[in-house]
Amino acid sequence: MRGPCCWPLSLLLLFLQSWETQLQSAGPRCYNGPLDLVFMIDSSRSVRPFEFETMRQFLVGLLRSLDVGLNATRVGVIQYSSQVQSVFPLGAFSRREDMERAIRAVVPLAQGTMTGLAIQYAMNVAFSEAEGARPSEERVPRVLVIVTDGRPQDRVAEVAAQARARGIEIYAVGVQRADVGSLRTMASPPLDQHVFLVESFDLIQEFGLQFQGRLCGKDLCAELVHGCQHLCVNAPGTFYCACNSGYKLAPDNKNCLALDLCAEGTHGCEHLCVNSVDSYFCRCRAGFALQQDQRSCRAIDYCSFGNHSCQHECVSTLAGPQCRCREGHDLLPDGRSCRVRDFCNGVDHGCEFQCVSEGLSFHCLCPEGRRLQADGKSCDRCREGHVDLVLLVDGSKSVRPQNFELVKRFVNQIVDFLDVSPEGTRVGLVQFSSRVRTEFPLGRYGTAAEVKQAVLAVEYMERGTMTGLALRHMVEHSFSEAQGARPRDLNVPRVGLVFTDGRSQDDISVWAARAKEEGIVMYAVGVGKAVEEELREIASEPSELHVSYSPDFSTMTHLLENLKGSICPEEGIGAGTELRSPCECESLVEFQGRTLGALESLTQNLARLTERLEELENQLASRK
């Protein structure tokens, strides 16, 4: 037996007329409430003419079962293929006859199948108020019926989900070759009530009757798990939730919230108002207690409980009791005990030379011969001194990068003390580990700012500790005239300053002695695990003036006083002269220079005076 898809056109039309008659006689028209109903008809080239005629007759028959009108159900129709075309919008017609006439006049587009594009159009245009859809606050159900015969050529999942999220209920009707997966992707849940696959024409009649029943009279509240907390209310083709008196619908449109009595502003609560089932009560914020009037709040005095154990003072906070120390004291890690504050601990005091704690404050001191400046922290500078200073810095792996940065900062503090210039103090820097590297020689930089910038740019070497190799490099290269040292006949003092944190991995004795033989005044600064015997072997005599030690890198700053007071030009100073300060040292040198100059000038003047007297004597003798 041939199926309906193979019937002659005359027999098909006769069948459609019979189906339309059955649909009209299946029951009364729907009067349960208004709908905004849009039909989205596939008119792609895959829909054959007699198939499109079937869909047309289906629409006409379904319209005759609806109570259409501007105040009842509004109907709109769009057709789509590769593009979307509005047959008539929701607000166009109020009479069924006008709608039928427009449907019978539709000419198929006969192109592709862009179903996703059509859903986008329905969501943004067809269901807009401009097209005749009623405002959302009127709660008129919006229903989209998609009728298609094939697989979409674009994506439908995302746009269909967006449409459903906007409250559009989607029915997906597939004819013969339609893709079931796409139908299920587009339709609203539950899918068994929103997805229809029509495999033959006789099932179109069955679908029409089922669909009419869905739109007209089904008790969805009774048949579905609606999820309403209080009340479920049927609407044509859908339902909505409502709440009992004294409640309002929550944003999820299912649960109910008690009316906010606190929002009325008459509760009188000092802090917080909390709604209950049929009333409200007051609550205080953390750290406060509710008073007897059940409205006002008072801060809780945690210190009054007597269990805080604070050594000095107890302060009640919202989080509980906290201990506080009196002025000039610091709270210990136990959070209870106090210790007298050492204002000189660390480097924040700002003193250039020495910091002295004094009661609840501190004051700065300068070496003898130098005066404290108006800022109360810095000291006046000595007059120009002539020194060639080479710094040997330990860059071995035991130092570690963070401590190496502290060494660089310490070096720059020494540079701040010096009068760096080509004619004054020249500074060179050598870093050593398993090898030796000249970072910059004596003659490269002529200002303290340039030297400090170069020090900050020095990169950490890591590896071993070859102090002996570094001393050899200093003796043979660093104090050479090629590296910027001044000639020996100028008698410019040569000073070597070694920073190290551990035992050398090579012998230092030979080159430490050689450095002193070459007239280099050696200073040794040890930090952490530095070996005292090696420091004394490196340094010049007396060792108490040339050796400095600090237990760790963070406390090196106290060494500055010793070093700054020791590095001083020695030219022209005789044995036995007591050097009390750098300024006194330079003053003696300057005094000797000026005295010698004055004596030489006086001698020259006396010689000229003698010559003049001899000339006068000769003149007197010739006159006789």
Curated annotation (Swiss-Prot):
Keywords, sorted A to Z:
Coiled coil, Disulfide bond, EGF-like domain, Glycoprotein, Repeat, Secreted, Signal
Q: Which PROSITE patterns match?
A: ASX_HYDROXYL, EGF_2, VWFA
Tell me where on the tree of life, at the top rank, the source sits. Answer: Eukaryota
Query: Mutating residue 319 to E leads to what result?
Result: In strain: C57BL/6J
Cysteine pairs forming cystine bridges in this chain are 221-232, 228-241, 243-256, 262-273, 269-282, 284-297, 303-314, 310-323, 325-338, 344-355, 351-364, 366-379
Q: Which residues are glycosylated?
A: 71, 307
Q: What name has this protein been given in UniProt?
A: Matrilin-4
Gene that codes for this?
A: Matn4
